[in-house]
Amino acid sequence: MIKRVLTALAATLLPLGAHAADAITGAVQRQPTNWQAIVMFLIFVALTLYITYWASKRVRSRSDYYTAGGNITGFQNGLAIAGDFMSAASFLGISALVYTSGYDGLIYSLGFLVGWPIILFLIAERLRNLGRYTFADVASYRLKQGPIRTLSACGSLVVVALYLIAQMVGAGKLIQLLFGLNYHVAVVLVGVLMVLYVLFGGMLATTWVQIIKAVLLLCGASFMAFMVMKHVGFSFNNLFTEAMAVHPKGAAIMSPGGLVKDPISALSLGLGLMFGTAGLPHILMRFFTVSDAKEARKSVFYATGFMGYFYILTFIIGFGAIMLVGANPAFKDAAGQLIGGNNMAAVHLADAVGGNLFLGFISAVAFATILAVVAGLTLAGASAVSHDLYANVFRKGATERQELKVSKITVLILGVVAILLGILFENQNIAFMVGLAFSIAASCNFPIILLSMYWSKLTTRGAMVGGWLGLLTAVILMILGPTIWVQILGHEKALFPYEYPALFSIAIAFIGIWVFSATDNSPEGMREREQFRAQFIRSQTGIGIERGQAH
């Protein structure tokens, strides 16, 4: 009984993970050049470059660059967060998962949402009241600035680097798939555009790129879902009946549990994605773009609504693809497989319901999706270097101008590194990188953010030991696990049997923080505990926070 409950829980928690990561790592067959898609995409690029130009005229200070001056509303920020979080892997990956496995796809898509109530109830308000530009501002509020900011920046940069590699390789593969462009050209194109957005437009341009992309993605997905439902007379019963009639698995597509093999791995990945969401630097950074805690709370509310709606749409799109794409020989190759692989299910459905023009629109939106995500990641990485490391550790008292200069140099370096890594990892299995990024965010960033805000006995010693332990455990266990040790390094048997380390590394991080804080009797530790009350009052009331300035 317990095993069944565990498996069910794991199935609910285990979102996209390796399966949907296939959307960005699966077999790719280059498609013929799609001119409609290229024209639509060029229109999107022209619009976003104009926004970057407009934003660059308004970026006058450090606050403008990192947080858009704190002038973004809760609704706008909610849309931007949704735009930052709904990746191409979730659009193409989940619909492909539903196309192949049916009901299981819904379980996976809902898993992505599980982390958001944690952010809403535990983190959003206090984070906004205590921080200015990065989550390290919050973690180091009453702890020692140097060591804590160094740890937070390292955690952020590792997460950003891993996530960025996955997105860049995904971008290259996807563009090769959708547009028929060369992989290297695609990676360079994404890298250059990402640098332009962030270098000149800062957070303001990044926010609007994410908002536009979210609106386009939601509109495109809504139209596809509407056309699918129209085809079946707006009856879910007809949708499922027709899908079961044409799917090779028949009625089995309506039963759950086919994708979860090992409850521990599933639970571990589920926890990693759930708590990792609350430790992703580019997501946490978005809470400083609003004026106060109330707007921060609204942001999460709207973001969760948009994402929940989007994942329901992907479910309808997946079943629509079974019915309209799976049963249509025009979308199959000579071997009876879907042209371009299963990850093209949603793209073929766009062709089936809206013709070539709509196919071009959806292809362009899929590319825009990646651009929005990498822009947010780059800005988070740059702020970790310039604000946390340069201005608060290496060169205390640096002027705003010097800090911004370092930030912009970092953006350029990150752009070059992202392009090189994207080309280097072209043929590698990058599915594990998203899982590892979330595991590190959950094992290093999340425990420190949570306990610094809620646990009065936390000290610098505990945070440092626990944070580094969590980060190193996540990386070491991932290397010793089946993905890297067996598949990439070629050993016969993995030293660590589970694919994802989060269950173990999160536990080690929390235990490490608790043990080393509880046993810290130094005068410094005592002083840090005494300062909790002042921090608590500020986190509840927001007295003294920087509010948005009118431009």
Swiss-Prot record:
MF terms (GO), sorted A to Z: acetate transmembrane transporter activity; glycolate transmembrane transporter activity; symporter activity
Keywords: Cell inner membrane, Cell membrane, Ion transport, Membrane, Sodium, Sodium transport, Symport, Transmembrane, Transmembrane helix, Transport
Key word Manganese present: no
TM ranges: 8-28, 35-55, 78-98, 105-125, 151-171, 185-205, 208-228, 264-284, 305-325, 357-377, 406-426, 430-450, 465-485, 496-516
Subcellular localization(s) per the UniProt record: Cell inner membrane
Main location: membrane
Record GO biological process: plasma membrane acetate transport; sodium ion transport
Record membrane topology: Multi-pass membrane protein
Domain of life: Bacteria
Protein name, UniProt field: Cation/acetate symporter ActP
